[in-house]
């Protein structure tokens, strides 16, 4: 993996994604080379046990939203937005919960990396996001400062918004009741 580095004043940053499927090691070593200089960094890693979740939705919904065609269309449709590496930083401070009705992690319905089983079909997959449970009339807020790079409909995720926060960091908001922003 070759990360993209972003200069911000006298600092240089790179976001390095680490998949939940990577084999566990107590550390990951990075070798960074720039203009003839080599630096080695070691990142300590904490082992995580991902929980399992049985998800009860109908076969009709699964065939409409979770079939191979919908998944492939989502991946293909979103690829250009996630490939873009905005060189400007739009974020600062800490991430916020995406709704004022969310007060703590008890509002998380499904966490990142959870082993999910669709009980109607037995299909298993890893969950690639974080699902928050909010009321249908609750406003959804951007978790970080940024610019909207996609606002529209996707078969798998319904009404969807993608926000670019800069430096390759993006958030995706899916299954929305309505959209009141534009690109």
Feature locations, PLM:
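Zn2+-dependent peptidoglycan hydrolase active-site motif and core
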Residues: 142-180
């Amino acid at each position: 993996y070759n990360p993209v580095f972003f200069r911000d004043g006298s600092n240089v940053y790179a976001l390095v994604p680490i998949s939940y499927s990577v084999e566990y090691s107590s550390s990951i070593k990075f070798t960074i080379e720039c203009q003839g200089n080599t630096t080695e960094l070691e990142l300590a890693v904490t082992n995580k046990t991902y929980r399992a979740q049985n998800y009860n939705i109908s076969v009709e919904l699964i065939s409409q939203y979770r079939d191979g065609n919908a998944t492939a269309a989502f991946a293909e449709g979103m690829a250009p937005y996630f490939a873009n590496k905005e060189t400007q930083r739009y974020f600062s401070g800490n991430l916020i919960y995406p709704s004022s009705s969310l007060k703590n992690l008890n509002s998380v319905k499904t966490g990142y990396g959870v082993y999910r089983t669709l009980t109607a079909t037995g299909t298993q997959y890893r969950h690639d996001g974080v699902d928050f449970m909010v009321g249908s009339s609750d406003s959804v807020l951007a978790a970080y400062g940024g610019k909207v790079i996609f606002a529209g409909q996707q078969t798998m995720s319904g009404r969807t918004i993608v926000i670019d926060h800069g430096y390759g960091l993006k958030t995706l908001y899916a299954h929305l009741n309505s959209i009141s922003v534009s690109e």
